[in-house]
Amino acid sequence: MYSERAKSIMPVRKLVVTGMLAGVSILLGSTPLGFIPIGPAKATIMHLPVIIGAIMEGPLVAIGIGLIFGVFSMIQAIMAPTVISFVFLNPLVAVLPRMLIGLTAYYTYKMTKSAAASATIGTLTNTIGVLGMIYMLYGAQFAAALGQDQGKAAALILGIATTNGIPEVIVAVIVVTAVTAALKRIRKA
């Protein structure tokens, strides 16, 4: 009897957690909280629900939440454009790296059992994935849009990675560690 009940509860719990994290992602994507302007670039905390989803419910849930993050990146590029928004109209820049956050965060957590390590790797996946795609697909155009020498695109992108990436990792480690610990305590209760 108990195993039958447990089998039916698990999908419901997963659905609830997925809905909650998707709702948080939609809220962050719909408000200035999710994309924080820093000059023409934007720092983000939208990767946090993706990482939390990876740790709590696995890679498929996290990939779905990452898809929401990526779609909102594209919407932001249209609704609140900056001089560099053109790069986020490409799903290879805006969506693919955000979906990969869930995979890297999940497998890091599975190997290390560390929310901090998972948060770090997930955040770096976002930063390196997005900026790497920008460099590969739009390096010179990106630098020109920022009024910089096109030959210095790599240095410019590395500067953005450092300026945005380090604070994003720090915030992710603090928030993801605290939230996943709280959710695990609730789950055990």
Model-identified regions with their sequence ranges:
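Loop-helix junctions at membrane interfaces
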Residues: 1-189
